[in-house]
């Protein structure tokens, strides 16, 4: 069967400590080809966010809590497009896609659970986006 390549690294082997606030510039310097990666999440308590983004100049803060098992972070590194966002041309690293989801290759790893939806069975995933000021 065809499957996505899976590498599971201990957090200690990553060049970023995701349990500490790290400027996005620092992350992109350490990952010059950008992010397009799946990060496993610990816990699924919607009262405890798994991701926090802060912008100190404006004082904006966004947290995300989800019942999903992972989160994909995709930076727009190398992405150039002929359209504008907020009056500025789209350019590399202008955005960050945040995608709470189950593991992309979960169908080949039954130990991670299942995304199969039997007929007439309800399945719910929740994601909470909270916006505040610092």
Could you describe each region identified by the protein language model?
Residues 1-4:
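Short, small-residue-biased leader/transition segments that mark boundaries at the very start
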Residues 11-134:
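Active-site pocket scaffolds in enzymes
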């Amino acid at each position: 069967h065809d499957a996505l390549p899976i590498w599971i690294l201990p957090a200690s082997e990553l060049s970023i400590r995701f349990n500490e606030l790290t400027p996005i510039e620092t992350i992109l310097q350490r990952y010059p080809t950008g992010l397009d990666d799946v990060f496993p999440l610990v816990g699924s308590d919607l009262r405890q966010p798994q991701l926090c983004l802060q912008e100190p100049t404006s004082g904006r803060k966004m947290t995300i809590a989800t019942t999903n098992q992972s989160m994909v972070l995709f930076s727009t590194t190398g992405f150039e497009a002929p359209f504008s966002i907020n009056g500025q041309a789209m350019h590399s690293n202008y955005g960050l896609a945040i995608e709470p989801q189950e593991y992309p290759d979960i169908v080949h790893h039954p130990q991670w659970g299942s995304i199969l939806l039997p007929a007439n069975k309800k399945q719910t995933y929740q994601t909470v986006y909270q916006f505040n000021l610092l």
